[in-house]
């Protein structure tokens, strides 16, 4: 029977220089999850270079995905208990062995017309895409800040907490999307078991405001 993957967890690049980053990594290594790295300061460098030289969005997109891979390498270097893999099969095998796995994305392996070569598609959307490829039950976004009030997906876009294509890549999916924020690394393991007690549920596009 194929392995059921309960969680894909996107670790925000904004945490790259946080003193809490090692604590998050140790917490992630405690439960078998797939970790999607943000672009972090590596993607910021791509933005700066594109603004200076004006090269095409297609190149910037591929470089930003490489930036995610670089951040993933850094995460594994900081926490050797985490493994690294680049394709769904290898990620699944690692989880079958009880390990947490950091995804190292490859732009050439993501030939999907929904993944636009644009800054409107960031690691949030790619985490949603990977969760779909893996058939994961839930997606958790770890952010350095959380919005006040209701977490409707469109409000997250407007506040800049997720990218503009995230609503489309998650539209119509039955997959649950959750948020957690600063200082919650201590609650991560319990939250993965009981997300409604520790995390904040994201209301998808198909749902109405309440």
Label every model-predicted segment:
Residues 1-196, 206-209:
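Nucleotide/pyrophosphate-binding catalytic subdomain
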Residues 201-202:
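An anion/pyrophosphate-binding glycine-rich loop and adjacent beta-alpha core
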